[in-house]
Swiss-Prot record:
Pathways involved: Carbohydrate biosynthesis; Calvin cycle
Cited SUPFAM superfamilies: Carbohydrate phosphatase
CDD domains (UniProt xref): FBPase_glpX (cd01516)
Keyword field: Calvin cycle, Carbohydrate metabolism, Hydrolase, Manganese, Metal-binding
Known cofactor(s): Mn(2+)
Keyword Lipoprotein: no
Name by which UniProt lists this protein: D-fructose 1,6-bisphosphatase class 2/sedoheptulose 1,7-bisphosphatase
One Pfam family hit: FBPase_glpX
Entry binding sites for Mn(2+) 1: 33, 57
Organism: Prochlorococcus marinus (strain MIT 9515)
Subunit structure: Homotetramer.
Amino acid sequence: MNQTLIQEILEVVEQAAIASAKLTGLGQKDEADAAAVEAMRLRMGKIEMKGKIVIGEGERDEAPMLYIGEEVGSGNGPGVDFAVDPCEGTNLCANNQRGSMAVLAASDTGGLFNAPDFYMNKLAAPPAAKGKVDIRNSATENLKILSNCLDLAIDELTVVVMDRARHKGLIKEIRECGAKIQPISDGDVQAAIACGFAGTGTHCLMGIGAAPEGVISAAAMRALGGHFQGQLVYDPSIAQTSEWADYTKEGNIKRLNEMGITDIDKIYEANELASGENVIFAGSGITDGLLFDGVKFEKDCTRTSSLVISTLDSTCRFTNTIHMKDGAKSINL
C-alpha cells in the first residue's frame, strides 16, 4: 500500500456517493444501493492493485459485483483487502434522512477480519478512553469511566444507540445514569467514528448492529486511535430480528465453527478486526451527517464531502471536492 492509494480510495467513495445521491428521497433503497455498487466497482477497477473484497454485498451467488472474494483492481501492484458498504444506510438515503454514506476500509492482504453476516455488540469511545472502558462492563460502569476520562459529568455525556427493541434495557440503564441518548435508525459506522472526534456532541456508541460494518468502524477507530470493541451475537433472541427467523442459536454456532471461528464469545479489539500493518478508512456523505455533508448538486458542479483516515501517514483528511461539469461557467466558493 502507498500514498497514491489514499487519493484513489477517496475517489472510490466519492463516486459511489454521487451515484446514490441521485436517488436520495425517492424511496428506492435497492436502486440507490445498486447505483453505488456499480460506481464503486467501476472506479476500483482503475486502481493499480491486486484488490480483493473480503466484506461486501454478499456471497458470489447473491450479488452481481463487490461480492465476497471478488478480485478488483488491475491485477498488478500491492495486495489490498477491502470491506465495503457502498451505500451505508440505504433507508436513510431512500428517505432523505441524515447519516447515509459510501464507506470502505482497506488494508494489506489478510489485514481485515472476515466477519460473518451476523450481528455484533459494539462499544466505541474517544481516544482518551481507549483501553479504559470495556464492553464487558455494564453501561453504568462505562459511563462512570468515560466521565472521568473526558472530565465531563455523566449528565453531559451523549450515547448513540440504534433505535431497536433489543436496546430497550440498555437505553433505560443509560438514562437512569443521567446520560443522554441519541437514537439512530440506521447506519452506525458514522456514529461510531464520530465518537472519536471532540466537538461532534457524541461521546460513545453502545449496542448491537451489523458485524461487517463493525469491521469498517474498527478500521477507522484503529487509524484514529479511538476505542472500539466488538463481540459477535449468534443468539437470535438477543438480536431480536426477523432476518434470523430461519436460524437457531445452535445453527448460528455451527456456521461460525464452519468459518473457523471456534471462540464464539471472543471480544475483538480494533487491532484484531483491522490487524494489517496499514489501514485506510474512507467515507463520503450521501446525505448530511455527523461528520460531513451529503452530496450537493449544483448547476455547474457536484460537491462531495468526505473523510479519509490512514495509518500510512497518520492523517485524517476532511475533504470537500468540487466535481466540475463540462463547460462549467461559474463555480461558487
